[in-house]
Swiss-Prot record:
Molecular-function GO term, any one: microtubule binding
Family: Belongs to the HDGF family.
Protein name: Hepatoma-derived growth factor-related protein 3
Region called Disordered, residue ranges: 90-202
Entry keywords, A to Z: Growth factor, Nucleus, Phosphoprotein
Source taxon at top rank: Eukaryota
Span of the annotated motif Nuclear localization signal: 135-147
Domain PWWP: 11-68
UniProt cross-references to PANTHER family, sorted A to Z: HDGF LIKE 3 (PTHR12550:SF82), HEPATOMA-DERIVED GROWTH FACTOR-RELATED (PTHR12550)
Length: 202
């Protein structure tokens, strides 16, 4: 099917929006709230159904919802996609709740501080908008765990009596945090050496 020429959209138009790494997502051309970051030239503020994320996209990445419903409107395993299909059909006027909380914050800050709230609310808004669908990407990364140095300590300590070692653990943590700036490798070696000395002392 030939791709249509980019067209003009207005606030409230329902579309499928395409972002790299994601399927064509059910979305709406959004109106800009007061104090929000202005979009770059030739880009529209987009509200994604299902996830309630926002982004700025050009007309070449937008497809009219009614015309492309059969092509892109099939259910998908992607988190939030099926909810988005339901929302665009049953609740197309759903609002992004973050706008309301930002407006409430800015009005309370104006009363309390007397002024510079437009900058604060636009910064918060800008972070959300710049992320676009970034939160969905980061959800995968959030479940990863970082390795910690405590796994070596706990395996050695589990061989010793737990009651005596609790006090030593606290002292070792204090020593470790108060030690003068060394690199992470030296800190680990010192901790291991301290454990060996502590084991010999008991």
């Amino acid at each position: 099917m030939a791709r249509p020429r980019p067209r003009e959209y207005k606030a409230g138009d329902l579309v499928f929006a395409k972002m790299k790494g994601y399927p064509h997502w059910p979305a709406r051309i959004d109106e800009l709230p007061e104090g929000a970051v202005k979009p770059p030239a030739n880009k529209y503020p987009i509200f994604f159904f299902g996830t309630h994320e926002t982004a700025f996209l050009g007309p070449k990445d937008l497809f009219p919802y009614k015309e492309y419903k059969d092509k892109f409107g099939k259910s998908n395993k992607r988190k939030g996609f099926n909810e988005g299909l339901w929302e665009i059909e049953n609740n197309p006027g759903v609002k992004f709740t973050g706008y309301q909380t930002i407006q409430q914050q800015s009005s309370s800050e104006t009363e309390g501080e007397g002024g510079n709230t437009a900058d604060a609310s636009s910064e918060e808004e800008g972070d959300r908008v710049e992320d676009g669908k970034g939160k969905r990407k980061n959800e995968k990364g959030g479940s990863k765990r970082k390795k910690s140095y405590t796994s070596k300590k706990s395996s050695k300590q589990s061989r010793k009596s737990p009651g005596d070692e609790d006090d030593k653990d606290c002292k070792e943590e204090e020593n470790k945090s108060s030690s003068e700036g060394g690199d992470a490798g030296n800190d680990t070696r010192n901790t291991t050496a301290d454990l060996q000395k502590a084991g010999e002392g008991t």
